[in-house]
Structures are given as C-alpha cells and as structure tokens.
C-alpha cells in the first residue's frame, strides 16, 4: 500500500506553517494542530486492516521528515507530529514507529543537540515516546519481500524543508572562531612583550591587521544573513515591500510639493496686470489670478486682435471691389460690338443724361 492521497499534502502543510512561526516550541505546534483539526485524520469508516495500514503509512511519512537532510526546525516539527499521530491513532494495539538500526545513531545525536540547545520540551517529547515504547527497531527501513522490482521507488525530498549544505558554515564553526580569537589575543600579547616599548609594539612585528578577527566575524555574520534571506525569500520580499512603500510615499510627497510650488508660480504670474503702451491703452485687458478669469482675458485679447485685422482689411477690400467693378465695366464695353443684346446703361450715364435733360430744359425756359 502506498501513501494515501492527500496525506503527504496535509503533513507538509502543517510543517510549513510550523516553519513560518520560526519557533520550536510545542505550544505553537499544538495551536496549529488544533486549528487544522489534525486529530480527526484517523476518523472515518475503515475496517481494522485498512486502519492499521493507514496508520503505518502515516507514521512512516512523519518519520521521513524527522531524519536528515531536513532542517532542525522541520525535524522538531516532525517529532511533534509523530507524538500526535501515535497518541491519536485508533488502532488496538497501537501501531509503532518503524526505526532502522542505521538511523538510530543519528536520532541519539539529535536528542543530544536538543538538550544542549535547551529545547527541553522537544527532549521531553522524545523521551516520552521512548518510555511508551513507541519505536519498533528493525534491520531495514521498509519491510522486504520476495518480489523483484526493476525500478526502486525513492522518496522525494521536499526542497522547502531541506537543510542546504553550506561549506562555509561547516568550515568556520563557533569553536573555530573561539580558537581564532584566542590565538589572535595571544599574538597581540606576545608583540607587546617582545617590543622595546611595552605600550606600543614595533611596526615590524605587525604582520597582520589588528581587526583581523573582527573582519572575519563580520564576514561570517553577513554570510549567515544572506543564507537566511535565500532560504526564506518571503521575509526578504516583505522587507522589500515595506521599503518600496516608504519610497513610494516619499515620492508622492515630493510630487505634491512640486505641484504646489508650480501652482503658486502660476498664480503669481497671472495675478500681475500687463501694462500696455499709451497707443493701446484703450485695448488693455485685466487679468485675474483665477484660471477662469485668465481664460476669459485670453478670449478678449483674441477678439480684439480679430477686430483689428478686420478693420485693416476693410479699406483694402473696398479698393479691391472698386477695381473689380471697373474691370467688369471694361469687359462689358469690349463685349458690346460682339453681342446682340440691348446696351446696358450704367448709373453714371443715367445721371449724365438726367443732368443733360435738366440743362436743356432750363435753357428753353430762359428762351421763353
């Protein structure tokens, strides 16, 4: 029987939430256990055989996260998960946790690390499981059979829970740093003893910098911080989001200040009255500070300019109309002998004829 569908997803969800708490306390794990209602995982209508098989698979899955290469926090969470699954199972007698002999040394080493780090709640949980005889020691991790398989199924390692191998941290441990500090202090004391001036050592003896150990310590701390940020990109993204929000707020305030300054400059510019020359004082336009008055003033200026253009164009238009009339008359005169229509008498000829008749009438009256 393989891993039941959904069981691995639920276990990884619980462990991932426990990892987000950044804690190894049993109280935090029990709170997540209650919120997810993980105690009801064995509830349901199952026969005894199915119940036993399901419990074995659940305990084997939790035991997988208790061993390397997973991080210390995930291993502690897996220990709490084993304790919860073992005590909430419904099998009678209880199914035990299958432990291979080759892994037991690693388990004892982890127990010692818990005690040294003073994580007594996790150490107590492990001791309680041992006293309850929850472990079943076997030669192999899985039950072997006579069936031959061409492809051996290997359990996939969850990368999120995996403890990345860091050669720098393996090389420079806390013990190595402490030993380097002792050697550096001894070296500085020996320089003072050898030199003539006890207060100041000779420059010829200073083969390394005085802050050599401090520089190495700072580099190691920076590497640890970079390693944490790489392992938990969510925390780094949150800090970056906070910085971006602060930068966005500062940019918005700068834009508001610029807009206010531009508005003040515009108001000052439009509040000043333009003084026209003496010849154009009758066309002077007053401008107010508001945008509406400035727009109306601009409209008035445009209207006055249009009127000036029309006045200038009027005499020129009259001259052009008179010229056009003369040209039309000349054209009619030239066309007279060619056309058979009646002659056209202009207003000037009518006036001359009328004046001629009046002149002849006045002569006749004088004669009489």
From Swiss-Prot:
Function (record text): Part of the SNAPc complex required for the transcription of both RNA polymerase II and III small-nuclear RNA genes. Binds to the proximal sequence element (PSE), a non-TATA-box basal promoter element common to these 2 types of genes. Recruits TBP and BRF2 to the U6 snRNA TATA box.
Chain segments annotated as transmembrane:
none
Q: Which GO terms describe its cellular component?
A: nucleolus; nucleoplasm; snRNA-activating protein complex
Q: Where is this region: Disordered?
A: 224-257, 275-368
Q: Which gene encodes it?
A: SNAPC1
Q: This chain belongs to which protein, by name?
A: snRNA-activating protein complex subunit 1
Task: Give disulfide pairs as residue numbers.
Answer: none
Q: Which GO terms are recorded in the biological process aspect for this UniProt protein?
A: snRNA transcription by RNA polymerase II; snRNA transcription by RNA polymerase III
Q: Name one GO molecular function term.
A: RNA polymerase III general transcription initiation factor activity
Alphabetized, the UniProt keywords read: DNA-binding, Nucleus, Phosphoprotein, Transcription, Transcription regulation
Q: How does it assemble?
A: Part of the SNAPc complex composed of 5 subunits: SNAPC1, SNAPC2, SNAPC3, SNAPC4 and SNAPC5. SNAPC1 interacts with SNAPC3, SNAPC4 and TBP.
Chain intervals with Basic and acidic residues compositional bias: 238-257
An example of a Pfam family matching this protein is SNAPC1
Annotated region described as SNAPC4-binding, given as residue ranges? 164-268
Location of the protein in the cell: Nucleus
* Main localization of the protein described in the UniProt heading: nucleus
Q: Where is this region: SNAPC3-binding?
A: 1-168
The species this protein belongs to is Homo sapiens
Q: Which residues carry this modification: Phosphoserine?
A: 289-290
């Amino acid at each position: 029987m393989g891993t039941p569908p959904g069981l691995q997803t639920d276990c990884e969800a619980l462990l991932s939430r426990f990892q987000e708490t950044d804690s190894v306390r049993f109280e935090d794990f029990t709170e997540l256990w209650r919120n997810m209602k993980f105690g009801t995982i064995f509830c349901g209508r199952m026969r005894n055989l199915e119940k036993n098989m399901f419990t074995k698979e659940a305990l084997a899955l939790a035991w997988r996260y208790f061993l390397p290469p997973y991080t210390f926090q995930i291993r502690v969470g897996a220990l709490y998960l084993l304790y919860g699954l073992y005590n909430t199972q419904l099998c009678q007698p209880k199914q035990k946790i299958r432990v291979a002999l080759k892994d037991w040394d690693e388990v004892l080493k982890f127990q010692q690390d818990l005690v040294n780090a003073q994580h007594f709640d996790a150490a107590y949980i492990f001791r309680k499981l041992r006293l309850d005889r929850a472990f079943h020691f076997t030669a192999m991790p899985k039950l072997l059979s006579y069936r031959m398989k061409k492809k051996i199924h290997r359990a996939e390692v969850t990368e999120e829970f995996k403890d990345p191998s860091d050669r720098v941290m393996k090389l420079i441990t806390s013990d190595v740093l402490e030993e380097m500090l002792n050697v550096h202090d001894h070296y500085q004391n020996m320089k003072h003893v050898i030199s003539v001036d006890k207060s100041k050592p000779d420059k010829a003896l200073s083969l390394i910098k005085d802050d050599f150990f401090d520089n190495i310590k700072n580099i190691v701390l920076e590497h640890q911080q970079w390693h944490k940020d790489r392992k938990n990109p969510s925390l780094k993204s949150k800090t970056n989001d906070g910085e971006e929000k602060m930068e966005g707020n500062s940019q918005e305030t700068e834009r508001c200040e610029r807009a206010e300054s531009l508005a003040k400059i515009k108001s000052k510019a439009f509040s000043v009255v333009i003084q026209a020359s003496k010849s154009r004082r009758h066309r002077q336009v007053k401008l107010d500070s508001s945008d509406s008055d400035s727009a109306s003033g601009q409209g008035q200026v445009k209207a006055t300019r249009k009127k000036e253009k029309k006045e200038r164009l009027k005499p020129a238009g009259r001259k052009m109309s008179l010229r056009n009339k003369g040209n039309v008359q000349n054209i009619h005169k030239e066309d007279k002998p060619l056309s058979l229509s009646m002659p056209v008498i202009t207003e000037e000829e009518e006036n001359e004829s009328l004046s001629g008749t009046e002149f002849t009438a006045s002569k006749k009256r004088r004669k009489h």
